[in-house]
Amino acid sequence: MSAKSKLYLLAGLSFLAGNAMAQHICISTPNTSLVLNAPNGGELKYLSYGSKLSETDLQHINEASNCNHTAYPVYGMNCPGEAALSVKHADGNMSTQMEVVSVSTNQENQSTLTTIHLKDKVYPFYVDVHYKAYQDVDMIEAWTEIGHT
């Protein structure tokens, strides 16, 4: 195999691996969609919120999205605006950097509960971000649960 072929193969595999790691989450009500980017090991970000998106729109969300804001901004790391959370760790450090660990979705009566599990990259500090989308009204409920071990 030539060096050029190896380079193309490596680039293709890198592209596939990058796309496999990205996880878009669409939280929808009858007339609205909230789209989040939750890459495993990466930062939770808003991609879009507005009118309900079609499957075609969702497939092209990265190309059209100009909204790339942190969904749960924390104090201490890349937070130019107001932080949703500020923590002073046991060693006195106030830097917190949350990464996506996993995502779970559960169907409930007339609603879908999506939970994004976040963990600090250094400390045993956890945040669960919950979104509950109702299927009979245009309402998305959001709350967090914070834990430390």
Predicted regions and their residues:
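N-terminal signal peptide c-region/cleavage motif recognized by signal peptidases
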Residues: 17-19
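N-terminal accessory beta-strand-rich subdomains and adjacent acidic, glycine-rich linkers
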Residues: 23-149
